[in-house]
UniProtKB/Swiss-Prot annotation:
It is found in: Cytoplasm. The active site is at D11, D130. GO terms for cellular component: cytoplasm. Belongs to the HisA/HisF family. GO terms for molecular function: imidazoleglycerol-phosphate synthase activity; lyase activity. Heterodimer of HisH and HisF. Signal peptide: none annotated. This is Imidazole glycerol phosphate synthase subunit HisF. It comes from Xylella fastidiosa (strain Temecula1 / ATCC 700964). IGPS catalyzes the conversion of PRFAR and glutamine to IGP, AICAR and glutamate. The HisF subunit catalyzes the cyclization activity that produces IGP and AICAR from PRFAR using the ammonia provided by the HisH subunit.
Length: 257
């Protein structure tokens, strides 16, 4: 098993980092570059940037801040937001991103996953999945979650989409558990465990981190490859060096700070 990854997530809106609860009521958390530099210095393994307004607004990510980040940090980072065609992905990678992530565009055009994998290699292609548990107990996919007014409920079951995304060429899956997002009550171990059983590529957990034990639990119980979090890092509730030390004490292999 490779070292487990600790991944701060930076939701971007109008050139600023924001954070909401269950994908709503976003508040400003700071400057993109300042936060990226802080996480680089504190030992993050990689960063994920989501331009949360891009897909709902029908536009692509702003390449200017991607270039600014790439010039200043030396850790891998992934960019998501409005990447609906190969040339847009090419521009994001050319601006300096190491990986691109697609979510709503992949739902609208599943063949995009294959096209991106063929153009850039599966190692560059991440599929993000926003998932919520419905009244019948099934987890299903949501689309356009960056704007609550445009969010769409789909009949597609989350676990079915995980299988299909891999078949099409996804090199990594980030599972955003919407019921847990921003509430700091722990990752959705039940959902992530079922996803793990079907996921042959790296799986990253997202949504629910509130304390260090939550990270240990998701690594031990769901066997994910990485844990993504936002509010606990942005607020300073958890420091990455302290978290990595805690995880080592729990016999979880992580990279040095």
């Amino acid at each position: 098993m490779l070292s487990r990854r600790i991944i701060p997530c930076l939701d971007v809106r109008d050139g600023r980092v924001v954070k909401g609860v269950k994908f709503r009521d976003h508040v400003d958390m700071g400057d993109i570059v300042e936060l990226a530099l802080r996480y680089r210095d504190h030992g993050a393994d990689e960063l994920v940037f989501y331009d949360i307004g891009a897909s709902p607004q029908g536009r692509s990510v702003d390449y200017r801040w991607v270039e600014r980040v790439a010039r200043l940090i030396d850790i891998p980072f992934c960019v998501a937001g409005g990447i609906g065609e190969v040339e847009t992905a090419r521009a994001v990678l050319h601006a300096g991103a190491d990986k691109i992530s697609i979510n709503s565009p992949a739902l609208r055009q599943p063949a995009l996953i294959s096209a991106l994998a063929e153009a850039f290699g599966v190692q560059c292609v991440v599929v993000g999945i926003d998932s919520i548990r419905e009244a019948d107990g099934q987890w299903r996919v949501r689309c356009n979650t960056g704007d609550p007014d445009k969010t769409q409920a789909l009949p597609l079951r989350t676990l079915d989409w995980i299988v299909e995304a891999q078949r099409l060429g996804a090199g990594e899956i980030v599972l955003n558990c919407m019921d847990s997002d921003g509430v700091r009550c722990g990752y959705d171990i039940a959902q992530l465990s079922q996803a793990r059983a079907l996921c042959q590529v790296p799986l990253v957990a997202s949504g629910g981190a509130g304390d260090m034990q939550h990270f240990a639990d998701v690594f031990h119980k769901a066997d994910v490859d990485g844990a993504l979090a936002a509010s606990v890092f942005h607020s300073g509730a958890i420091s990455i060096p302290g978290l990595k030390q805690f995880l080592r004490e729990q016999q979880i292999e992580v990279r040095d700070v």
